[in-house]
Regions:
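N-terminal "domain-start" segment that seeds a small globular fold
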Residues: 1-15
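A short acidic, often aromatic-flanked loop/helix-cap motif at beta-alpha or helix-coil junctions
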Residues: 12-13, 59-62, 96-98
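Local sequence-structure signature of Cys/Sec-based thiol-disulfide redox active-site neighborhoods
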Residues: 14-45
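Thiol-based oxidoreductase modules, predominantly thioredoxin-like and allied folds used
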Residues: 27, 49-65
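Amphipathic alpha-helical interface surfaces
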Residues: 34-41, 58, 62, 66
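Short loop/turn motifs at secondary-structure junctions and domain boundaries
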Residues: 69-73
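Non-catalytic, surface beta->alpha helical segment in thiol-disulfide oxidoreductase systems
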Residues: 75, 80-103
Length: 103
C-alpha cells in the first residue's frame, strides 16, 4: 500500500470496496482546479483518522460505490467523515479545507 505524501496525516489510496468504520474519504478529480487546491488542504490536515483518497476520473467504480453505499450525492472534490460506518459530515468543493475537521 502506498501512502501519499502528506504532512500530518496518513493518506491511503483507495484500491477496493472496503473502508474502516471510522475514516475520512476524499474524492479528488485530477482535471479540476478546485480539487488541486483542496487536495493540498487535505494533505495539510491534522487528524488521527486515516484518509482514503479516490481519484474519481480514474476510479469511477469506487467513487460510485462510495456514493451508493453511503447514500451521498457525488461531487468532487468531496470529503466524507465516516464514524461508526455512517456518514457524519460531508464537505464539497471549497468547503474542503485543512480546518474543516479536527479529531
Amino acid at each position: 500500500m502506498v501512502i501519499l505524501e502528506a504532512i500530518n496525516v496518513s493518506i491511503i489510496p483507495m484500491e477496493n470496496k472496503a473502508l474502516p468504520a471510522d475514516c475520512l474519504v476524499y474524492k479528488h478529480s485530477t482535471t479540476c482546479p478546485v480539487s488541486t487546491t483542496t487536495g493540498q488542504e487535505v494533505r495539510a490536515m491534522k487528524t488521527d483518522l486515516p484518509i482514503y483518497w479516490i481519484n474519481v476520473r480514474e476510479q469511477r467504480e469506487l467513487s460510485n460505490w462510495v456514493a451508493q453505499i453511503y447514500n451521498v450525492v457525488h461531487e468532487s472534490p468531496q470529503l466524507l467523515l465516516i464514524r461508526g460506518g455512517k456518514v457524519e459530515k460531508v464537505w464539497s468543493h471549497y468547503e474542503v479545507s485543512r480546518n474543516c475537521f479536527s479529531s
